């Protein structure tokens, strides 16, 4: 099975590669940091499975790439991989055409189970994101708006830009 890994963090990308190398039947044909690159790889050749991070190199949107890849290669299975703890990501991944979603906080064994199930035609989407500790609070204690502000902060936006993005004065 031909596998492409799209992950901007080198250490995470290497870890994901090691999971596939430890199992028979998988061949990593591309391991790249950017979503735009993934679309180009799919234009040039077929891939059986893609692990696609939501936010990749240069803030490229992995979900946009999922949509574009599915238009080019509808039979390619795509598992969205994320550490974002927002229910909106689940819905956006489904709308983009992802076949499954896996949270980075989950175990290696769980990823390989999701891979096998996805390749067998199942769609694996958790009911809700995992609960994560953010400082002294749990992710489940934040409102959608608070999570949206946190996401903007993680993207490096200024307070002024966040206010503008959220329609505040």
Predicted regions and their residues:
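Active-site residues of response regulator receiver
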Residues: 53-55, 82
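Conserved acidic carboxylate
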Residues: 7
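Short amphipathic alpha-helix used as the core "switch/output" element in two-component signaling
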Residues: 63-75
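Short, flexible helix-to-coil linker/hinge segments that flank and couple to helix-turn-helix
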Residues: 89-94, 99-144, 148
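Acidic, metal-coordinating helix/loop segments flanking the phosphotransfer/catalytic sites
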Residues: 31-49
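A short, hydrophobic beta-strand element within the central beta-sheet of small alpha/beta folds
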Residues: 75-85, 98
């Amino acid at each position: 099975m031909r596998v492409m890994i799209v992950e901007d963090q080198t250490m995470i990308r290497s870890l994901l590669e090691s999971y596939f190398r430890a199992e028979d039947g998988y061949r990593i044909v591309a391991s790249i940091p950017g979503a735009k690159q993934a679309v180009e790889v799919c234009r040039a050749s077929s891939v059986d499975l893609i692990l696609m991070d939501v936010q990749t190199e240069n803030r490229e949107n992995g979900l946009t790439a999922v949509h574009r890849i599915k238009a080019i290669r509808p039979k390619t299975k795509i598992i969205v991989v994320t550490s974002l703890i927002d229910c909106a990501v689940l819905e956006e991944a489904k709308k983009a055409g992802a076949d499954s979603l896996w949270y980075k906080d989950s175990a290696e064994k769980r990823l390989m189970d999701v891979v096998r199930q996805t390749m067998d035609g199942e769609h694996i989407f958790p009911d809700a994101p995992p609960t994560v500790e953010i400082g002294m609070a749990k992710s489940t204690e934040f409102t959608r708006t608070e999570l949206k502000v946190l996401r903007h902060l993680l993207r490096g936006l200024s307070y002024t830009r966040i206010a503008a993005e959220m329609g505040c004065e």
